[in-house]
């Protein structure tokens, strides 16, 4: 769900629970001050119970630091293993299979129904 139009921010008051926004590529950062009137905080990434919460999937070189990367952005939920340049300079190093550590929670893919962390960990 995008936060690009501040005219709908008031609807956030209708939601129960803590509201923390992880900004994405469609969110307008110049509206952050206004958004903070309706949510607890705004972040680019959150480390929660060893899980990395982001808008877009994190780089495969970073996934080993987390239990899961819970993200959206990939609306078709199609990630693939890739070769990458490790941050230590090794060329063409094949990453260990890690797709099971990426969980896409795009609103459309999860039928607009929230999932608990336990549900995501057990999928």
Model-derived regions: residue spans:
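Active-site neighborhood of phospho(di)ester-bond hydrolases with catalytic His/Asp-centered motifs
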Residues: 1, 19-25, 53-54, 68-73, ...
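Core catalytic region of metal-dependent phosphoesterases/phosphodiesterases
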Residues: 1-47
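Histidine (H) residue identity feature
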Residues: 8, 26-31, 55, 59, ...
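Short, flexible, glycine/charge-rich loop motifs used to bind or transfer phosphoryl groups or to couple energy/partner
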Residues: 9-12, 43-44, 55-62, 92
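Short, conserved active-site loop motifs that form the nucleotide-linked donor/cofactor pocket
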Residues: 19, 36-40, 51, 67, ...
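Binuclear metal-dependent phosphoesterase catalytic core
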Residues: 47-49, 59-68, 74-123
């Amino acid at each position: 769900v995008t936060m690009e139009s501040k005219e709908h921010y008031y609807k956030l008051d209708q939601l129960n629970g803590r509201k923390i926004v992880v900004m994405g590529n469609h969110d307008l950062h110049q509206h952050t001050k206004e958004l903070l009137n309706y949510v607890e905080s705004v972040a680019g990434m959150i480390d929660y119970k060893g899980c990395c919460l982001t808008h877009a999937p994190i780089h495969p070189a970073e996934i080993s630091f987390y239990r899961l990367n819970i993200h959206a952005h990939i609306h078709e939920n199609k990630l693939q293993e890739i070769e990458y340049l490790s941050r230590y300079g090794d060329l063409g190093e094949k990453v260990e299979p890690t797709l099971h550590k990426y969980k896409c929670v795009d609103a459309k893919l999860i039928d607009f129904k929230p999932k608990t962390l336990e549900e995501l960990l057990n999928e």
